[in-house]
Amino acid sequence: MTVMRKSHPILKIFNNSFIDLPTPSNISAWWNFGSLLGLCLIVQTLTGLFLAMHYTADISLAFSSVAHICRDVQYGWLIRNLHANGASMFFICLYLHIGRGLYYGSYLFKETWNIGVVLLLLVMAAAFVGYVLPWGQMSFWGATVITNLLSAIPYVGATLVEWVWGGFSVDNATLTRFFTFHFLLPFTIIALTMLHLLFLHETGSNNPTGLNSNPDKIPFHPYFSYKDLLGATLMITTLLTLVLFSPNLLGDPENFTPANPLITPPHIKPEWYFLFAYAILRSIPNKLGGVLALLFSILILMIVPLLHLSKQRSTTFRPFSQTLFWLLISNVLILTWIGGQPVEHPFIIIGQLASVTYFTLFLVVMPTTALLENKLLNW
């Protein structure tokens, strides 16, 4: 008799995805981030659901309703801080997951990779509209500045901005629709995550060597289920430490002031996880140019598979490409730092140089180095 998990129509899908899944025996801890992202998504959806039960999407009540959640709702402070800092954990895991993909050549699974890039864009959209909901100063001005970027689109820009705002400025209509989007997007993200997994399981996972894994695979459970459990424990511990000891560490003090259209904060800046893109946006003196650079700073990931000119998949055995990879990481960290600084000398020129370096590494230096390494293989 076949085991029920192998024959039942629904359990069979679960079994083939999480229990009897053939997995490369040598995948390292860098392969843990997929499951950690799944965990983040579950935590964010559940905490978000409970917050939505008490939140009011109205400009006269939004700020007060968040204060009410933190003061009067049972464990509301915990739910709110888990949700706010859970977003940071989500992005940490996302960036590490993408970094892993770039380092080990996982992007050659094109469908999986491109769905992943779309997922990144959706998570960024969800985080942006979510940041507006508490209706603090930085929420309001962040929404104003970022939505205003749409006005850079030729011909339809101005109309588009008014359409997104639902009026002639960021107002009640804007808050209401942002709450709608913030509620809707996670479910779209969950659906795409399933597709992401579906395409991944068509090919199987890559591994640190970049070689074919088929000769040496082991069942996902118990080996990697326990490995994932360890990763999950470490992540939850980190998240709880942040939430319980320093919940406002990554937030902006400006957001403790209710939104006021008449007072502009001295430095308008997004949450830390958007700072690298914000720095690229600001480094270009032209509005439309900045918006395009901002867009391409993320969309460039979609053409990475086309720019892979090396005969080897992973950078494990390519010291030159490894050096460039870490240069890229350093560059993104510099951009993140610049994004949080005021627009003045020397930050302007540093941001411009880092932005040029970012695109040059992806489009020119890395592919050229890959070709050079191919030549070296023949020596």
UniProtKB/Swiss-Prot annotation:
Keywords: Electron transport, Heme, Iron, Membrane, Metal-binding, Mitochondrion, Mitochondrion inner membrane, Respiratory chain, Transmembrane, Transmembrane helix, Transport, Ubiquinone. Component of the ubiquinol-cytochrome c reductase complex (complex III or cytochrome b-c1 complex) that is part of the mitochondrial respiratory chain. The b-c1 complex mediates electron transfer from ubiquinol to cytochrome c. Contributes to the generation of a proton gradient across the mitochondrial membrane that is then used for ATP synthesis. It is a multi-pass membrane protein. PROSITE patterns: CYTB_CTER, CYTB_NTER. InterPro entries: Cyt_b/b6_C, Cyt_b/b6_C_sf, Cyt_b/b6_N, Cytb/b6-like_sf, Cytochrome_b, Cytochrome_b_C_euk/bac, Cytochrome_b_N_euk/bac, Di-haem_cyt_TM. This is Cytochrome b. Its main location: mitochondrion. Pfam families: Cytochrom_B_C, Cytochrome_B. It comes from Iguana iguana. Its cofactor is heme b. Binds 2 heme b groups non-covalently. Belongs to the cytochrome b family. The chain crosses the membrane at residues 33-53, 77-98, 113-133, 178-198, 226-246, 288-308, 320-340, 347-367. SUPFAM superfamilies: a domain/subunit of cytochrome bc1 complex (Ubiquinol-cytochrome c reductase), Transmembrane di-heme cytochromes. The lineage of its organism: Eukaryota, Metazoa, Chordata, Craniata, Vertebrata. CDD domains: cytochrome_b_C, Cytochrome_b_N. Gene3D superfamilies: Cytochrome Bc1 Complex, Chain C (1.20.810.10). GO terms for cellular component: mitochondrial inner membrane; respiratory chain complex III.
